[in-house]
Amino acid sequence: MQFMMPLDTNACAQPMRRAGEGAGTERLMERLNIGGMTQEKALRKRCFGDGVTGTARCVFTSDADRDTPHLRTQSSRKNYADASHVSAVILGGGTGVQLFPLTSTRATPAVPVGGCYRLIDIPMSNCFNSGINKIFVMTQFNSASLNRHIHHTYLGGGINFTDGSVQVLAATQMPDEPAGWFQGTADAIRKFMWILEDHYNQNNIEHVVILCGDQLYRMNYMELVQKHVDDNADITISCAPIDGSRASDYGLVKFDDSGRVIQFLEKPEGADLESMKVDTSFLSYAIDDKQKYPYIASMGIYVLKKDVLLDILKSKYAHLQDFGSEILPRAVLEHNVKACVFTEYWEDIGTIKSFFDANLALTEQPPKFEFYDPKTPFFTSPRYLPPARLEKCKIKDAIISDGCSFSECTIEHSVIGISSRVSIGCELKDTMMMGADQYETEEETSKLLFEGKVPIGIGENTKIRNCIIDMNARIGRNVIIANTQGVQESDHPEEGYYIRSGIVVILKNATIKDGTVI
């Protein structure tokens, strides 16, 4: 039997469990098999700054006195990753075509999620929870609301950065480059290399974490950086097992027994897709049906040595614009590129359907992912709203955000955003309602109704199912939104809605008149 004990005078020895011996957060150690290699990852609290928690291992041998365990420290690692020497770059994404119409007036990372958060809060919070507080956010299309949210939440929202900073870098036209828009993920970083390089040198940055702003997951990035350091990798790609239905939407990787990436293909199809199948039996401890996940996909999360990043963007691959489609397929041939498999919950919010499903999944029991974790909280803009007010309502499997006002309504399997108003007799099922960023008083609501207008929120006796309702939408009385004809794709912008993958999407600030049937 073995024990793990933090090298802390106030800590006590606790049993070490291998995968399968314990469940959930009770596991203190898990083994991750990559091919023929076994990588041991200690699940322990890391000290931010210069200190790092170490461990001692107690081993009972056949001749040992079991009443007097002998401790020996473990010194297999020579270098520990220091969060103070790590910087993060969060890519704000492109035009957000796949999430349209939710991205018609906002950047993808600014899309509301989980009732009161924005997608940008996911990588930002993961950074803070990992001890990484030197962050750059690259923005481009429809970035006004994203910039506003970042400012309110992270630049003026009370989060203490100590020696850290958050800087927003918007796409800018340069004198020698008439086309100011980012041409790809690598080009986005390259265009601001003059700012980044100066920052890296001043702060002794050794490693750079590159992140996406359109994913839902919880990760300690310093665990990824530590593996990057242990492997002495030039580039480390965070990967996840996926099924065949989505494989062609991602960059796929193959790696050898040491975890070194030997092949990278961006969004392969046909024979190329088939050639990227791998034996995922090494994930049997984490995946029930390993045959369902025959591919390993890049999560779009990378760790690079600072010097390697500067070299590939300024010199070696200065003409290439994108990491996934151009740089990584070449880098695996010329650099030490390693894979790190992530088996916890991860969802790429790349389409209306995946966005819708991921939000509603938050209401299921037990949920695959939840925002409730006091040790690794997710931050968002402080709004100082009152608690939700519910009068004679029936609520089942739902998330209700602050500031809501419900009266004698029924809500099931739905996520309701901040400051939402749902009136008497309403029925909502399988609905993602983003809420409102403004209040209309009872007097204002009564006046609008008297004038034959529609106030913000949902009017009396309205029935809604399988729907996304964007911010500040006005839905009248006796409306039915159910898509009973099963239409998959349809555009009705003049009427205030679209249909994507069979899901009705009510536009931001749209007005749906009384008695409308969709």
Curated annotation (Swiss-Prot):
Give the source lineage, highest ranks first: Eukaryota, Viridiplantae, Streptophyta, Embryophyta, Tracheophyta
Protein name as catalogued: Glucose-1-phosphate adenylyltransferase large subunit 2, cytosolic
Q: Disruption effect? A: Shrunken seed endosperm due to a strong reduction in starch synthesis.
Question: How might one describe the regulation of this protein's activity?
Answer: Activated by 3'phosphoglycerate, inhibited by orthophosphate. Allosteric regulation. Inhibited by inorganic phosphate (Pi).
Q: Which GO BP terms apply? A: glycogen biosynthetic process; starch biosynthetic process
Recorded hits in PROSITE patterns, A to Z, give: ADP_GLC_PYROPHOSPH_2, ADP_GLC_PYROPHOSPH_3
Q: Which InterPro entries match?
A: ADP-Glc_PPase, ADP_Glu_pyroP_CS, NTP_transferase_dom, Nucleotide-diphossugar_trans, Trimer_LpxA-like_sf
This protein's pathway reads: Glycan biosynthesis; starch biosynthesis
Q: What, per the annotation, is the impact of changing residue 171 to I? A: Reduces activity more than 3-fold
GO terms (molecular function) for this protein are: ATP binding; glucose-1-phosphate adenylyltransferase activity
What does this gene product do? Involved in synthesis of starch. Catalyzes the synthesis of ADP-glucose, a molecule that serves as an activated glycosyl donor for alpha-1,4-glucan synthesis. Essential for starch synthesis in seed endosperm. Is essential for both catalytic and allosteric regulatory properties of the cytosolic heterotetramer enzyme.
